[in-house]
Amino acid sequence: MQIVEQMKDKALAELNLVKDKKTLDDIRVKYLGKKGELTEMMKLIATLPNDEKPKLGQAVNIAKQALQEAINLKLANFEEQELNEKLAQEKIDITLTGVGQNQGSLHPVTKTLNRIEAFFKQNGFAIEFGPEIESDYYNFETLNIPSHHPARAMHDTFYIDETHVLRTHTSGVQIRTMEKQQPPIRIIAPGRVYRCDSDITHTPMFHQVEGLLVDKDVSFADLKGLLHAFLNSFFEKDLKVRFRPSYFPFTEPSAEADIECVMCDGKGCRVCKHTGWLEVLGCGMVHPKVLKAGNIDSEKYQGFAFGMGVERLSMLRYGIDDLRMFFENDLRFLKQF
């Protein structure tokens, strides 16, 4: 038994001098491996008298347990040391200046379109699209725009050939929808439109959203209620809205909707030309001739339509005074949204 105790003390002394995991494992194999010194001691039990066998077995097991615990403790210390060294090497200096990340965002026109579409989808309107190169028939004739109307003039419209134009509005989508679908109809038609015009409030290409509702017992009061709710939602405030009589060949009666100037709260400023009001959209009850062109019985059904310029609404919502800024790709401007 004394030999076992001496062997244990020797092994523990060697452990105290270990400086690395490799040497530690060598000591483990030397004493606890299959051919280790303490393992070999267990083989001597068979040669001892019966009364001494339990004593030797107990002594060897105590020695092996003590040695294994010491090895485990030493190993844990090495692993903790390695972890601390690794953490020190990978340490992040949080006092250093951060690296800027260029994060993209939606164009203000896209944001405005999404906002418009979201409101009308919540109110049961579907979204319809149509071709940007439109025939004279869908762009003018079916919308009660006669051949002598100024909108057909070369200086107002981009002509592809004698019978096709770059659409001047998305109203053609309304006719196409009525041709393929019977009432009730609730649609909006967003998209690009084109006109021969370019200044701080006009560009040759801009975005428009037109809406159409056709059903039984539809009145101008329904139109006013819907548009008033839309404008309050879009500008996120309770606005004063007025409807002025106007003229559009495809609606009768027709009106233009104005809102109290969002820049000066109706007090009068440069944006509203000191009137206190801003024109935001056109609207009216669908003309019977337009319903007829879409194969809708105007005696049975009524409808209303409206149209708005997306850039115009964007300018008012974000306080932009030059329409051309939307299309100049100036990152100093676009990063603000």
UniProtKB/Swiss-Prot annotation:
Looking at the keywords, is Nucleus present? no
- GO process annotations (BP): phenylalanyl-tRNA aminoacylation
Compartments where located = Cytoplasm
Which InterPro entries does this one have?
aa-tRNA-synth_II (IPR006195), aa-tRNA-synth_II/BPL/LPL (IPR045864), Phe-tRNA-synth_IIc_asu (IPR004529), Phe-tRNA_ligase_II_N (IPR004188), Phe_tRNA_ligase_alpha1_bac (IPR022911), Phenylalanyl-tRNA_Synthase (IPR002319), tRNA-bd_arm (IPR010978)
User: Which residues bind Mg(2+) per the record?
Assistant: E252
Its Enzyme Commission number(s) read: 6.1.1.20
Cofactor: how bound: Binds 2 magnesium ions per tetramer.
Requisite cofactors = Mg(2+)
Q: Which GO terms describe its molecular function?
A: ATP binding; magnesium ion binding; phenylalanine-tRNA ligase activity; tRNA binding
Grouped into one coarse class, the protein's main location is cytoplasm
Catalysed reactions, semicolon-separated: tRNA(Phe) + L-phenylalanine + ATP = L-phenylalanyl-tRNA(Phe) + AMP + diphosphate + H(+)
Q: What class of enzyme is it?
A: ligase
* Alphabetical list of Pfam families matching this protein: Phe_tRNA-synt_N, tRNA-synt_2d
Q: Which UniProt keywords apply?
A: Aminoacyl-tRNA synthetase, ATP-binding, Cytoplasm, Ligase, Magnesium, Metal-binding, Nucleotide-binding, Protein biosynthesis
Q: Which PROSITE patterns match?
A: AA_TRNA_LIGASE_II
Q: Which GO cellular component terms, listed alphabetically, does the Swiss-Prot or TrEMBL entry include?
A: cytoplasm
> Record's family?
Belongs to the class-II aminoacyl-tRNA synthetase family. Phe-tRNA synthetase alpha subunit type 1 subfamily.
Please describe the quaternary structure of this protein.
Tetramer of two alpha and two beta subunits.
Identify this protein by name. Answer: Phenylalanine--tRNA ligase alpha subunit
Instruction: Record the organism.
Output: Francisella tularensis subsp. mediasiatica (strain FSC147)
Gene encoding this polypeptide? pheS
